[in-house]
Amino acid sequence: LAILAIASLSAAAGTGDAVFNKAIAAYKAAKGIAVKYSMTGAVGNSSGEIIMQGNKFCITASNMICWYNGKTQWSYSTMSNEVSIMEPTASELQVVNPFSVISNFQTAYTATLMKGNASSNIVQLRPKNARTSQFSQVVVTIAKKTNLPSKIIATMRDKSKISITLSGYRTGGNFPASTFVYNKKYVPAGTQVVDLR
């Protein structure tokens, strides 16, 4: 949060674009990625692992599992003991998976480079269409060594914030398609499935 309060803009949006385009290239070059995450803020606190490949992902945490195969999303919650099925919009995906900000950057956001440090660049993203975006802004810290995000702070339209720290990247994976599709063996027997499509 201090970053948002004290960081000064240090370059034009085009420079922010260049930094973020490097992040997009690094994400694509990494192919399959697994990364540990820790999240705090408006939607509660959680930690776990995100596995990503192209536009697919699987998020595993202590209280939920979420699968997305590029079209359909299955979300299991330990609190409700049910699996919900939906076909999310691009805007909805950004709330579930922070890396969706990267894949939607060129069409959805304008980038400005902020004051970083010796090891990281910091880029502020503002939505091109504020009415349809879930966020009013997203600040992404990108490691210079890997060009991959290490922290994401998203400000919702109601001014609440979500902070996500990313660490322990494993790249170059080749995950089977089944990784990103709901499998009942990962949830308790008798779990209710609710189809919201």
Please describe what each predicted stretch is:
Residues I3-N45, N55-K56, N81, Y186-R197:
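N-terminal leader/targeting segments and the immediate start of mature chains
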Residues A26, G48-M52, I65-C66, T110-G116:
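Short, exposed beta-strand/loop patches in secreted or surface proteins that constitute
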Residues K31-I33, S46, N55, S62-M64, ...:
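Envelope-exposed proteins and targeting segments
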Residues S38-T40, T60, Y76-T78, R126-K128, ...:
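A generic structural motif
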Residues S47-V96, I162:
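An acidic-aromatic
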Residues P88-S120:
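Flexible, surface-exposed loop/linker segments and immediately adjacent secondary-structure boundaries
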Residues Y109-A111, G116-V187, V194-L196:
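Gly/Pro-enriched, hydrophobic low-complexity segments
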